[in-house]
């Protein structure tokens, strides 16, 4: 309509008028104006813009059933021009103009879509009248009070009383005797319905506090059913007469029987409430898995009372399978303690099980010894985050104690005390009893609240480690104590542990703090270890350990080593490293295959513990002058190494392992975990019998400023390494008259030559991928010569570049050459020409002859060495699958006669300059100057020590026959 406002005096016509005019006078109709005029007129003359959704005018003859008649209004307003030439008809330009006009008009004048459906909105309904007039409410409330609202408490109650239906409902008995009314929905008990109490009604609002009891008692059958089922579900085959908890809730209120019975229960629980604290505030003497503590009563009869503990959800699922007497209120002496004395434990260990009072905070424990203390909680205040570490599930629903006792009958297996598992048949040693076994001269250095601990191999049913049936560590009586000044501690803290591995990897974050008595002379004083848990998620309180008795074994060592004597840790299912340490004083080694391991691998390799003295794994600058196996370190952390370095043939003296400086050197390694094992056996030598183990092996992966002190004795014994790989046994013979010291030290370590053991680097389970060019190991022999390598050994990617070194220090007596075998090849009986060729086909090896030259370990590029490259390359070994690549495999050496030079082949080799990556043609890059002195076919021409380095993925079975034939050929 805005288009018609442009002319003065003209009025817009309605559509009806337009239709009438078009029918009567079609020729006199005004032509439509151009579009620009319409726009101009509308824009100029309209005072305000048109409404977008104004109501459309309904034409008078509009039919709702036929809405198409009104749709053509735009066509009526803008009809198509009549063609000028009737013969040709209308032109496309006319069509376009009319189409454009109609569209623009329809867009500017939107109209509502007419629908045949009529929606009628009714007015709001009137509010209902109140139930009673307002004047009555005012009169009842009094003139001085405000009239209460219609929804107040009093009006609602009056309305309920006045209502006949409601009054009849509450006046009738709630629980009639008729069965029809019992099945009626009105008889269902509800806590939110008003009740009659002393003739007065109570409000609708639910009241806080305890719920009201039913006024009428149900039938005796229903009461017996509910009480019997509820108690039977809690504890099977034990008759109970009380509810499982002292607190009332809606469930127990609806299922309880009567008010009189509940009163007797409450009176009964007031006496037992003292000895049953709420979960998770557990008592110190309470086992985390045993809530039905078995304790013989004074009369010897079984009493059927239940210590009604409100245990947690985990404890309800891990109830032990033992059934028997429980703590009752008739025996007041046993009240407050929950120390079980299992009959199976007494039968196995053969010790009388006396009940031990719980060790409360600030109370000195009594001097009673019992095997039944194995289920004590290791700390009085345990962080709830550590609860999952203590609840290790036992197989087939039985207790862990029964499972452990069935492992071995001759030895007492015990779990590691840092595991916090409640099942280890050990003997608690208090301060007084522990001090009684120590000479008075050594008691001054003993802490007042320390206890002897035996963190031997875990025997719990955990997926972390397997079950070990024999004691893990036995120490000679002459190598036990350490000085007081060397307060050493190990804090092996490795990488992050996943949340799903907290229970199984409880050994992965262990801080074992150790102390020892102040004595430089050898004695049988046991060491002191105080394990504490290092935080995995945040800070965790230190864990007080359970004292254990360290067994002393006097059995003579066997002359040969069997593969089954090596204890294997199976089922290494954790992805975090773990530490297993042991301190057991013993006069002699019981089993020759017992080894010491620092397990940091997930490959399930064999790990064992050697017979050695106190293992102090930690950070300390001091190194005692005693013949002990000690693990001090400068650095607080030990990084993960991607190799399995197994030191077999370790004759016990002093072992020193320092952590790496850096962990960012594992560049091409997919699995960052490894296994570092130290194995030692005590066996008689060739010429003498039962000589003491006094040789020293010092192993350090970092740097240490303190030199190693030589041990007091220099007798070396012949030893055979155990089957470290679980499949093979390698035997390396050593002349008893000669000795040398083998050590892996960092570059800046000053090491004095000490009596020795023979070192065999056993087969690695994980290969070192290519690009391992850092951490140059150096084979160092300061006594006679020094040999250095320029790059990384294929199996030893430890440390940054130029930060760690691998040195083999040996002391050469009587000018006799000994060889330390690194790799899978043994020394050859003879050599060919200018190069030492391997006897077996497909056996790559590197033999390095050490010249008489000594350099510093830090200047690795200047270190002289001689490298003999061979036909085969290390690529053939390194490119295999990971389970077949054995960069460093320990293979038994050939005969090394006593007092005779070793049959080690020498040859003049080709110098190889520069550092070579581990994935190149040679396994390790070495800076190799020329050989000082040519070595021909005679293997005995030079008396310098030689080092055979190489790898071979062959098995021992395929290798031994060929070697035996070649050896016979040499003899002929």
Curated annotation (Swiss-Prot):
Biased composition (Basic residues): 40-57
Residue stretches of biased makeup (Low complexity): 413-431, 697-706
Residue ranges with Polar residues bias: 287-302, 339-352, 677-696
Protein name, as recorded: POM121-like protein 2
Entry's family note: Belongs to the POM121 family.
Source organism of this protein record: Mus musculus (Mouse)
InterPro entries: Nucleoporin
Region annotation (Disordered) ranges: 1-67, 281-302, 328-359, 406-431, 676-726, 953-972
């Amino acid at each position: 309509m805005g288009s018609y406002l442009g002319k003065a005096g003209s009025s817009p016509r309605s559509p009806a008028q337009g239709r009438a005019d078009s029918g009567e006078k079609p020729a006199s109709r005004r032509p439509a104006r151009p579009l620009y005029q319409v726009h101009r007129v509308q824009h100029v003359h309209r005072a305000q813009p048109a409404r977008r959704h104004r109501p459309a005018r309904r034409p008078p003859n509009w039919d709702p059933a036929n809405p198409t008649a009104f749709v053509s209004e735009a066509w009526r307003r803008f009809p198509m021009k009549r063609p000028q030439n009737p013969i040709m008809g209308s032109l496309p330009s006319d069509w376009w103009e009319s189409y454009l006009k109609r569209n623009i008009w329809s867009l500017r004048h939107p109209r509502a879509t007419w629908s045949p459906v009529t929606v009628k909105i009714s007015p709001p309904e009137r509010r209902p009248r109140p139930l009673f007039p307002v004047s009555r409410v005012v009169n009842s409330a009094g003139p001085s009070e405000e009239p209460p609202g219609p929804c107040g408490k009093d009006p609602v109650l009056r309305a309920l009383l006045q209502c006949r239906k409601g009054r009849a409902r509450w006046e009738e008995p709630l629980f009639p005797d008729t069965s029809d009314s019992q099945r009626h929905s009105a008889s269902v008990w509800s806590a939110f319905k008003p009740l009659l109490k002393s003739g007065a009604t109570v409000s609708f609002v639910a009241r806080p506090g305890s719920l009201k009891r039913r006024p009428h008692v149900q039938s005796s059958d229903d009461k017996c059913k509910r009480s019997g089922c509820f108690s039977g579900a809690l504890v099977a085959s034990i008759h109970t007469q009380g509810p499982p908890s002292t607190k009332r809730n809606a469930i127990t209120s609806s299922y309880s029987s009567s008010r009189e019975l509940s009163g007797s229960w409450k009176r009964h629980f007031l006496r037992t409430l003292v000895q049953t604290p709420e979960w998770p505030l557990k008592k110190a003497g309470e086992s985390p898995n045993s809530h039905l503590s078995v304790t013989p009563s004074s009369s010897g009869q079984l009493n059927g009372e239940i210590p009604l503990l409100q245990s947690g959800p985990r404890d309800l699922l891990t109830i032990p399978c033992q059934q028997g007497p429980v703590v009752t209120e008739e025996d007041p002496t046993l009240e407050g303690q929950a120390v079980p004395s299992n009959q199976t434990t007494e039968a196995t260990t053969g010790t009388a099980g006396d009940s031990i009072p719980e060790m409360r905070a600030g109370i000195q424990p009594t001097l009673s010894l019992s095997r039944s203390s194995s289920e004590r909680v290791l700390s009085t205040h345990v962080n709830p985050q550590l609860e999952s570490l203590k609840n290790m599930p036992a197989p087939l629903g039985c207790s862990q104690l029964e499972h452990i006792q069935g492992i071995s009958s001759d030895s007492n297996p015990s779990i590691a005390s840092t595991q916090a598992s409640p099942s280890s048949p050990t003997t608690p040693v208090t301060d007084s009893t522990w001090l009684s076994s120590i000479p008075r001269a050594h008691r001054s250095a003993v802490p007042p609240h320390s206890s002897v601990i035996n963190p031997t191999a875990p025997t719990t049913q955990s997926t972390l480690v397997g079950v070990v049936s024999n004691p893990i560590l036995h120490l000679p009586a002459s190598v036990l104590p350490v000085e007081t000044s060397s307060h050493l501690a190990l804090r092996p803290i490795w990488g992050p542990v996943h949340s799903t591995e907290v229970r199984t990897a409880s050994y992965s974050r262990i801080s074992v703090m150790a102390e020892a008595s102040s004595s430089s002379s050898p004695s049988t004083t046991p060491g002191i270890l105080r394990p504490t848990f290092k935080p995995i998620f945040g800070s965790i309180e230190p864990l007080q350990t359970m004292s254990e008795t360290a067994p002393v074994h006097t059995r003579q060592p066997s002359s040969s080593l069997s593969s089954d004597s090596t204890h294997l840790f199976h089922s290494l299912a954790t992805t975090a490293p773990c530490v297993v340490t042991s301190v057991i004083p013993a006069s002699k080694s019981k089993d020759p295959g017992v080894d010491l391991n620092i397990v940091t691998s997930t490959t399930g390799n064999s790990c064992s513990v050697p017979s050695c003295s106190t293992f102090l794994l930690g950070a300390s600058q001091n190194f005692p002058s005693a013949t002990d196996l000690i693990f001090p370190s400068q650095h607080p952390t030990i990084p993960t190494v991607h190799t399995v370095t197994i030191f077999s043939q370790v004759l016990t003296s002093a072992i020193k392992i320092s952590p790496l400086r850096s962990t960012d050197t594992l560049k091409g390694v997919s699995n960052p975990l490894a296994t570092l094992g130290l194995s030692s056996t005590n066996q008689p030598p060739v010429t003498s019998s039962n000589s003491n183990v006094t040789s020293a092996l010092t192993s350090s992966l970092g740097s240490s400023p303190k030199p190693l002190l030589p041990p007091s004795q220099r007798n070396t014994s012949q030893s055979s390494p155990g089957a470290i790989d679980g499949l093979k046994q390698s035997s390396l013979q050593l002349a008893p008259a000669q000795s040398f010291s083998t050590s892996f030290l960092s570059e800046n370590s000053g090491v004095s030559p000490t009596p020795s053991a023979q070192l065999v680097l056993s087969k690695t389970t994980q290969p070192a991928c290519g690009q391992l060019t850092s951490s140059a190991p150096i084979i160092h022999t300061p006594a006679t010569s020094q040999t250095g390598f320029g790059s990384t050994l294929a199996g030893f990617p430890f440390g940054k570049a130029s930060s760690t070194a691998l040195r083999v220090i040996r002391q050469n007596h009587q000018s006799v050459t000994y060889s330390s075998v690194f790799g899978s090849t043994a020394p050859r009986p003879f050599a060919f020409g200018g190069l030492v060729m391997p006897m077996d086909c497909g056996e790559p090896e590197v033999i390095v002859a050490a010249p008489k030259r000594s350099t510093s370990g830090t200047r690795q590029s200047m270190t002289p060495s001689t490298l003999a490259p061979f036909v085969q390359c290390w690529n053939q070994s390194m490119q295999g699958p990971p389970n077949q690549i054995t960069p460093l495999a320990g293979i038994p050496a050939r005969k090394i006669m006593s007092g005779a030079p070793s049959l080690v082949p020498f040859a003049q080799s080709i110098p190889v300059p520069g550092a070579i990556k581990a994935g190149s043609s040679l396994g390790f890059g070495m800076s190799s100057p020329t050989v000082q002195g040519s070595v021909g076919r005679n293997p005995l021409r030079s008396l310098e020590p030689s080092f055979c380095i190489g790898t071979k993925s062959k098995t021992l079975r395929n290798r031994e026959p060929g070697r035996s034939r070649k050896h016979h050929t040499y003899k002929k």
